[in-house]
Amino acid sequence: MPKTKKAHRHAPDWIILTIACLAQFMVVLDVSIVNVALPSMQRDLHFTIDSAQWVVNAYVLTFAGFLLLGGRAADIFGRRRVYLTGLTVFTIASIGAGFAATGSQMVAVRALQGIGGAILSPATLTIIVTTFHGKRLPRALGLWSAVAGAGGAVGGLLGGLLTGWASWRWVFFINVPFGILAGVLALRYLREMRNRDAAVKLDVTGAVLVTGSLAALIYGVVNTTTVVNSRAIGWTATSTLLWFLGAALGLATFFIWETQVASHPLVPLRIFHVRSLSMANLVMLLIGGAFFSMWYFLTFYYQYILGYGPVKTGFAFLPMAIAIIVGAQTSSRLLPKLHARPLLLIGTSLATLGFLWLSRIGVHSSYTVDVLAPSALCALAIGLLFTPLASAATTGVDRADAGLASGVLNTSRQLGGSLGLAVLGTLAADASARFARPLSAAALTSGYERAFQVSAGIALIALATSLAVPKVIVAHPNH
């Protein structure tokens, strides 16, 4: 049973939503805001082209690796304590990134920032699902989903504006006022809540095994794109296969430990018996694979093919942010009436159509005629999907496992995004190389077309998987 400490003062719904959404916005924003600033960062910190990718990879690696631990920590130590811990680590790391003087310093603080994000992000969803109930929950999830989805698009806009008008360092400093505001509100209004039965039990061995295994898996994936002697290492390189082997052995050991040895497992595998949670995470894995790469490829398409600068690239993403917000708000209003599965079917259908449409872009395409509508359609699909996925993944579980369910869902999204970007990046590079060498604008566009075609196929698989999500999800008695 949850144990609740007396709040410092009664908090209106909008303040709790602000506490959760502000922190989630910071975490999601930092995944995309760096992309537009990378060329300037690379020049000032004297990165090589090959090593600059680790500004992104270091964050992704630790963020994905620590998400399950962060989610379970919110259940065990309390959502308020974990939220403030993650927020502090994330904000301090942002300051460090803004002041970084060398490439190695930047990679180190980005890794620390990823750990802070992994602690913080599951806590934000835990705050939502343990505070709001009944008809209030879909509305709260809708706003949280809108913020989570729009952060990717807004990151491109803010990154372009800050890099073009100030300095790339401000893509990190921008987190500081948000972090201070969120921290003050949490200290003043957020009450503590944790699982009394698990209050003093943390499965340290399980945490080490799953964190190390996921980190090895993600490292193996990003290792495929590492360039050595002008060629990517690829999927069949010995180093890549060794990382995958280590991840497989670690996950197998983790499974045995959790099911046979641990008295208080980090991830009680019983939660995967909840079909809504299992299927929602599978859909999220697929959707993450398709959508994470969209931001990446469109950023390069705008700058290298259409010739946009950082600021114009940022504004090109603005309609997508608006579409995500519209989709999320629409989804939150329809969820109590339609339930999750119909919304998932609609969202994945729109995503499939949007990616197919995007796959028709060319060297001489126009943004307003050929890119705006399909990218907005994909963004609308993101908004429609996140709310029912969050609802399906958390409604059927005990409130004592809310943080864990949040961590699992975030892990699925991040793991899908990392795998999707690596696979689609490899396919795009292969298509470009087959088209022409040295690479031309037409060759690069050919690679982007291939990536969007495969993304449409992934979205179609997600559509089929959505049929397995229960039509009506019964809430757990202790939810």
Spans of features found by a protein language model:
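Helix-loop-helix hairpin linking two adjacent transmembrane segments in secondary transporters
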Residues: 151-184, 202-210, 218-244
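Interfacial helix-cap and linker-helix signal at transmembrane-aqueous boundaries
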Residues: 41-42, 73-74, 158-166, 221, ...
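C-terminal module of multi-pass small-molecule transporters
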Residues: 77-89, 100-108, 120-126, 132-143, ...
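Transmembrane core module of solute transporters
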Residues: 12, 16-63, 167, 205, ...
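C-terminal membrane-cytosol helix-exit motif in multi-pass small-molecule transporters
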Residues: 177-195, 211-226, 246-261, 462-472
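Flexible interhelical linker loops that connect adjacent transmembrane helices
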Residues: 7-9, 183-212, 227-236, 260-275, ...
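Transmembrane-helix bundle of Major Facilitator Superfamily
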Residues: 2-188, 330-331, 338, 344, ...
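Hydrophobic alpha-helical segments of secondary membrane carriers
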Residues: 23, 143-147, 205, 283, ...
